[in-house]
């Protein structure tokens, strides 16, 4: 069996999870394989030789990216040169489309096979990117069925592989066991999840804590749990919590345990909303961006929804409160009835979970190996 050399680039924590799962499946299906590129700790643990820390790519928002643009462009140029010299059997860009799509285009021009894993939101905005994808990408692997339909219509080779989180998370999570593990009492419990990036927590952290205080005034028995994505986010949240009298437990990571344990979630729009959906926890989605970023996006977005649960349901399944509509009072009022209710949401969540549960990492690995004839 000849040794395969596979290059992968992931740009943030969610991509690191998907990349590690794909690498594990590739090693089972083709044990003689080595991995190069850029990834986080999970991908490195599976054997990736990472050229630089993945955190250097984790930037969100049009305005925010501008401040780091020179560094990002320089890193991408160097990465393209390195990968063309290394000549991997296949390159897999995992999400991070503004960084990886250009790499795919250049590598494909150099006759290197290219795969993009996780569709960018081309169906929602900047639809002309599909032309670049068609030119630069031998195969698109999508997590969601509505994305695969979009690419089929546009003539892009595509495979819907499902989502590895839907495989990993049980159809019915044990709330009592999760609470026992975390040492949490019975009674109403709300998870607060203001995001994993510093900018997100800066815009949403205090707002979510204000909403928690309003909710506590409406429902004196309610308690809160807040997972911190990193030590840096914990410091940031501890500063925001100072001088607030809230029955709140901070966790280091453990977002899945927090979701399993809670009754409802106040959550930033992003990948975590999919996790909340898979745990069948009723949610209210909120988001704030830099005002200029929001103004630009509002004029570009084609989709009526921003959150994954609504995009997957193709209807308004969960409330979305954005920008100026995301006030502490509005969030508390919208969340309160979901603590004991939310059955319509959870029914929809169960249906979506079953659709996405397809053994994603193995499906993706088979598709990659099929592309390169292995």
UniProtKB/Swiss-Prot annotation:
Instruction: Give the signal sequence positions.
Output: none
Q: Which Gene3D superfamilies match?
A: Glycogen Phosphorylase B
Protein name, UniProt field: Lipid-A-disaccharide synthase
The entry's function note states: Condensation of UDP-2,3-diacylglucosamine and 2,3-diacylglucosamine-1-phosphate to form lipid A disaccharide, a precursor of lipid A, a phosphorylated glycolipid that anchors the lipopolysaccharide to the outer membrane of the cell.
**Pathway assignment:** Bacterial outer membrane biogenesis; LPS lipid A biosynthesis
Which organism's genome codes for this protein? Pseudomonas fluorescens (strain ATCC BAA-477 / NRRL B-23932 / Pf-5)
The UniProt entry's coiled-coil ranges are: none
What InterPro entries does the database record attribute to this sequence?
Glyco_trans_19
Share an example GO biological-process annotation for this protein.
lipid A biosynthetic process
Question: Which reactions does this protein catalyse?
Answer: a lipid X + a UDP-2-N,3-O-bis[(3R)-3-hydroxyacyl]-alpha-D-glucosamine = a lipid A disaccharide + UDP + H(+)
List the taxonomic lineage.
Answer: Bacteria, Pseudomonadati, Pseudomonadota, Gammaproteobacteria, Pseudomonadales
């Amino acid at each position: 069996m000849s040794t395969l050399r596979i290059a992968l680039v992931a740009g943030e924590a969610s991509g690191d999870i998907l990349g590690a799962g794909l690498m594990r499946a590739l090693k089972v299906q083709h044990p003689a394989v080595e991995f190069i590129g850029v990834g986080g700790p999970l991908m490195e643990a599976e054997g990736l030789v990472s050229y630089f820390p993945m955190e250097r790519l984790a930037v969100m928002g049009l305005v925010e990216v501008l401040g780091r643009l020179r560094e990002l462009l320089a890193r991408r140029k160097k990465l393209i040169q390195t990968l063309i010299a290394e000549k991997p059997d296949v390159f897999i860009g995992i999400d991070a489309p503004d960084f990886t799509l250009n790499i795919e285009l250049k590598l494909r021009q150099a006759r290197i096979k290219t795969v993009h894993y996780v569709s960018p939101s081309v169906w929602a905005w900047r639809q002309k990117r599909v032309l670049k994808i068609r030119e630069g990408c031998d195969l698109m692997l999508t997590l969601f069925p509505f994305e695969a339909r979009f690419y089929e219509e546009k003539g892009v080779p595509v495979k819907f592989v499902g989502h590895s989180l839907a495989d990993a998370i049980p159809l019915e999570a044990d709330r009592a066991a999760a609470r026992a593990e975390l040492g949490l009492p019975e009674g109403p419990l709300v998870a607060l999840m203001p995001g994993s990036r510093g900018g997100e927590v800066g815009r949403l952290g205090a707002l979510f804590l204000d909403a928690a205080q309003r909710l506590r005034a409406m429902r004196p028995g309610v308690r809160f749990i807040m997972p911190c994505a990193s030590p840096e986010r914990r410091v940031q949240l501890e500063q925001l919590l100072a001088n607030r009298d809230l029955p709140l437990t901070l966790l280091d990571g453990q977002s899945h345990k927090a979701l399993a344990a809670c009754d409802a979630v106040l959550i930033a729009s992003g990948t975590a909303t999919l996790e909340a959906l898979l745990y069948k926890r009723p949610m209210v989605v909120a988001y704030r961006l830099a005002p200029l970023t929001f103004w630009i996006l509002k004029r570009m977005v084609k989709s009526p929804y921003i959150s994954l649960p609504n995009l997957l349901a193709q209807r308004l399944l969960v409330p979305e409160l954005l920008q100026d509509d995301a006030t502490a009072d509005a969030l508390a009022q919208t969340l309160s009835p979901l603590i004991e209710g939310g059955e319509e949401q959870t029914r929809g969540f169960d249906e979506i979970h079953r659709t996405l549960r397809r053994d994603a990492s193995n499906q993706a690995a088979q598709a990659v190996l099929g592309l390169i004839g292995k």
